[in-house]
From Swiss-Prot:
It comes from Saccharomyces cerevisiae (strain ATCC 204508 / S288c). The lineage of its organism: Eukaryota, Fungi, Dikarya, Ascomycota, Saccharomycotina. This is Replication factor A protein 1. InterPro entries: Euk_RPA1_DBD_C, NA-bd_OB-fold, NA-bd_OB_tRNA, Rep_factor-A_C, Rep_factor-A_N, REPA_OB_2, Rfa1. Signal peptide: none annotated. One of its GO terms (biological process) is mitotic recombination. Residues 197-284 bind DNA.
């Protein structure tokens, strides 16, 4: 039995008594249930259920509280005392949450005090008149600095109180007068559970206004990224608000931003890791801030160029390199007939690797940096067609000669050692079995056997594992080797055939006359130790078979002999495979799924040279 008295009925008091709402600390509660929250910040926050003996409610553990909870491995029955917290009411959804920043453990593994306690959300749903009203918990400071009457009203969702944690106090102290008028939050703290907040942030990226037209009508949107010392968050405005905020916001300047709506981020449209993004609308308030202290100009998570070979295709990375070569710009035409300008540059770094970076449209035309310049590239996309390369996207940023320590160090290395160095390229080159000799030597040395990959359980780490094998293709599945994809530019979603013979894409909300077939090919490979099933997606399958999926699908229907000839031509041929292993769970069954990240035919001269070198080393040992 528990010898500790819980703060019985305290949750009801917090949300019905103004004095308790303003100071909701010191309560003693029991852990009622636990579960990890979803999202990119799940390692920082835990959503749990706590009980005061009469009611139970949700608690979101943040910062120190989240770290403590995980390190102590707290579980149902443990009793805690809350040290720092603030309540929040999400009025639209009738949710009541306690945001806990710190607590202490009072008793472990206590018996449950009341397993039939009332869920607080349900109680207040039945007794809505008992809770504090907006005017009771929204002081004048929280609605100050409004510029017109339409913005002066209380927002739809009731605000949390303005108790600040340590990180938030650091931001508020940058402006001594702001603490009474606005709670300054760190960007990493933003979530739908905070409803009165202001961030002080720099516009680290500003996109152009984009327009669209479909069956539902016309529209336009505008994107910016906001940056502070804790992280970055994407913001989007639509239609008239896109025009309004495009005129207000300038890249590089610092602003106070408040009253924007928080919604889950869409990873396919952003290179940031924040689990939420801002929607700038009629209620959003943005004021320029002339105190830029403690607001960084940019934030990077650099990786070395040699690590790009292990990155997922279509992932976004930050890189720092020296511009080694600059190619002339040229023109490309898409399947839809749209023309694009492109320029390729090559960057190198002190990992000994080089990689191609594709610039597009106006950036490709205007590029004028000299060779030997330092380039910091943020949010550049990893591609894999004929080897790994990088491609600038709509929100990628290239900063020339940035004034950061890493850039000075890299420039010093290049001037003293790197200018005349030989670099390994990740781009495949004709005539060398797909790669340079130096690159092939490195890949040959990295090989392991299939049996070793299976014995070491590669793929069970959180992000999966990469490994290389030399193996022969023993079988190719010719059924369901491709899927019908949308034929619109930059859309690969599966389409469904309609009764009228057209193919519909729900994402684009369009019907097209024919699909664009894309590979999802399954093969079996063998080496001297074991067998493995692999999946190849479109780029890798085209490289293996030498034809695209549209062509092979036509041959299957119109020329079965040629179809068989192509599919059998690769069987029992040896290749070098770069494989990504990752654990998959389906119907509560876990298994390792293997996909091909890269492949190339064997270069027997390089193989012989490598074996000769290894024999020489063994003889000299």
């Amino acid at each position: 039995m528990s010898s500790v008295q819980l703060s019985r009925g305290d949750f009801h008091s917090i949300f019905t008594n103004k004095q308790r709402y303003d100071n909701p600390t010191g309560g003693v509660y029991q852990v009622y249930n636990t579960r990890k929250s979803d999202g990119a910040n799940s390692n920082r926050k835990n959503l749990i259920m706590i009980s005061d003996g009469i009611y139970h409610m949700k608690a979101l553990l943040r910062n120190q509280a989240a770290s403590k909870f995980q390190s102590m491995e707290l579980q149902r029955g443990d009793i805690i005392r809350v040290i720092i917290a603030e309540p929040a009411i999400v009025r639209e959804r009738k949710k009541y949450v306690l945001l806990v920043d710190d607590f202490e453990l009072v008793q472990s593994r206590a018996d449950m005090v009341n397993q039939t306690s009332t869920f607080l959300d349900n109680y207040f749903s039945e007794h809505p008149n008992e809770t504090l009203k907006d005017e009771d918990i929204t002081d004048s400071g929280n609605v100050a600095n409004q510029t017109n009457a339409s913005n002066a009203g209380v927002p739809d969702m009731l605000h949390s109180n303005s108790n600040l944690n340590a990180n938030e106090r650091k931001f508020a102290n940058e402006n001594p007068n702001s603490q009474k008028t606005r709670p300054i939050f760190a960007i990493e703290q933003l979530s739908p559970y905070q409803n009165v907040w202001t961030i002080k942030a720099r516009v680290s990226y500003k996109g152009e206004i984009k327009t669209w037209h479909n069956q539902r009508g016309d529209g336009k949107l505008f994107n910016v990224n906001f940056l502070d010392t804790s992280g970055e968050i994407r913001a989007t405005a639509f239609n008239d608000f896109a025009t309004k905020f495009n005129e207000i916001l300038q890249e590089g300047k610092v602003y106070y931003v408040s009253k924007a709506k928080l919604q889950p981020a869409k990873p396919q449209f952003t290179n940031l890791t924040h689990p939420y993004e801002l929607n700038l609308d009629r209620d959003t308030v943005i004021e320029e801030c002339f105190d830029e202290s403690n607001v960084p100009k940019t934030h990077f998570n650099f990786i070395k160029l040699d690590a790009i070979q292990n990155q997922e295709v279509n992932s976004n990375v930050d890189v720092l390199g020296i511009i080694q070569t600059i190619n002339p710009h040229f023109e490309l035409t898409s399947r839809a007939g749209k023309k694009f300008d492109r320029r390729d540059i090559t960057i190198v770094d002190d990992s000994g690797f080089s990689i191609s970076v594709g610039l597009w449209n106006q950036q490709a035309l205007d590029f004028n940096l000299p060779e030997g310049s330092v380039a910091a590239i943020k949010g550049v996309r990893v591609t894999d067609f004929g080897g790994k390369s990088l491609s600038m996207g709509f929100s990628s940023t290239l900063i020339p000669n940035p004034e950061i320590p890493e850039a000075y160090a890299l420039k010093g290395w290049y001037d003293s050692k790197g200018r005349n160095a030989n670099f390994i390229t990740l781009k495949q080159e004709p005539g060398m079995g797909g790669q340079s000799a130096a690159s092939l030597t490195k890949f040959i040395a990295q090989r392991i056997t299939i049996a070793r990959a299976q014995a070491e359980n590669l793929g069970r780490s959180e992000k999966g594992d990469f490994f290389s094998v030399k193996a022969a293709i023993s079988f190719l599945k010719v059924d369901n080797f491709a899927y019908p994809a949308c034929s619109n530019e930059n859309c690969n979603k599966k389409v469904l055939e309609q009764p009228d013979g057209t193919w519909r894409c729900e994402k684009c909300d369009t019907n097209n006359a024919r699909p664009n077939w894309r590979y999802i090919l399954t093969i079996s490979i063998i080496d001297e130790t074991n067998q493995l099933w692999l999946t190849l997606f479109d780029d890798q399958a085209k490289q293996l078979l030498g034809v695209d999926a549209n062509t092979l699908m036509s041959l299957k229907e119109e020329d079965p002999n040629e179809f068989t000839k192509i599919t059998q031509s690769i069987q029992m041929n040896e290749y070098d495979f770069r494989i990504r292993a990752r654990e998959d769970t389906y119907n509560d069954q876990s298994r390792i799924r293997y996909t091909v990240a890269n492949l190339h035919s064997l270069n027997y001269r390089a193989e012989a040279d490598y074996l000769a070198d290894e024999l020489s080393k063994a003889l000299l040992a």
